[in-house]
Design a protein with these regions (language model features):
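A generic structural signal for short beta-strands and their flanking turns/coil linkers
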Residues: 34-38, 54-56, 67-71, 86-88, ...
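Gly/Ser/Thr-rich active-site loops/lids in small-molecule metabolic enzymes
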Residues: 82-85, 90-126
């Protein structure tokens, strides 16, 4: 993608390099990268109420009140745990540098065939992120919510209210996203530039003094 402004984590090609990049693409000299996507289904009282395709993450989050919620999580129909937390993030490798990273989850290399479950502010210190292969199916049931509102969001764009007993099924989608990679930057260079990863931020004056 071409970055027309903003952080542009997925749009690796700056606007100044648009025409050279188009030339390389037409010549078949640009690498195409395939990214995992997720499918999320909400089941209420045995009936499917919505289905969404997700590139970055599925997030279950409590409302404005400072109360935790209980989420029963099953992996391939086997009980994993009950997360007592502010919420839960299910993230793809593409989305691992977004909300997942802010919540203490790891960065996943974007072409990995896996996804990650990351609790948001868990009540129990032993509740930590867990990495799963793409073949696994995750089932999350809202077992307790009290009076507060609990929201389910898809890629931070679409919101959906969850009620006690609702079940969210998440699995690998049949669809894949194909991205054209920048010929000038690798993934780790993008991490350093966009997220200031692996070191303290510096400005051009600091860089000039170091070179001098």
């Amino acid at each position: 993608g071409v970055n027309l402004g903003g952080l542009g984590f997925l749009t690796e090609i700056p606007l100044r390099n648009l025409y050279p990049a188009v030339t390389l693409m037409l010549e078949g000299r640009l690498e195409v990268e395939t990214r995992l996507m997720l499918e999320a289904v909400v089941v209420r009282q045995g009936t499917e109420t919505c289905r969404f395709l997700v590139l970055n993450d599925v997030v279950i989050n409590k409302g404005a009140l400072a109360r935790i919620i209980d989420l029963d999580v099953f992996i391939n129909d086997q009980f994993l745990t009950t997360f007592r937390a502010d919420g839960l993030i299910v993230s793809t490798p593409t989305g691992s540098t977004a909300y997942n990273l802010s919540a203490g989850g790891p960065i996943l290399y974007p072409t990995l065939s896996s996804f990650i479950l990351t609790p948001i502010c868990p009540f129990t210190l032993t509740n930590r992120p867990i990495l799963l292969p793409e073949s696994h199916v995750v089932s999350i049931t809202l077992s307790r919510r009290g009076e507060e509102r609990v929201s389910l969001t898809f890629d931070g764009q679409v919101g959906f209210d969850l009620f006690q007993g609702d079940r969210v099924l998440i699995q690998k989608a049949k669809e894949k996203l194909k991205l054209i990679k920048s010929p000038d930057q690798g993934y780790f260079e993008i991490l350093r530039e966009k997220l200031m990863w692996g070191g303290a931020p510096f400005n051009s004056r600091d860089e000039g003094q170091q070179r001098g």
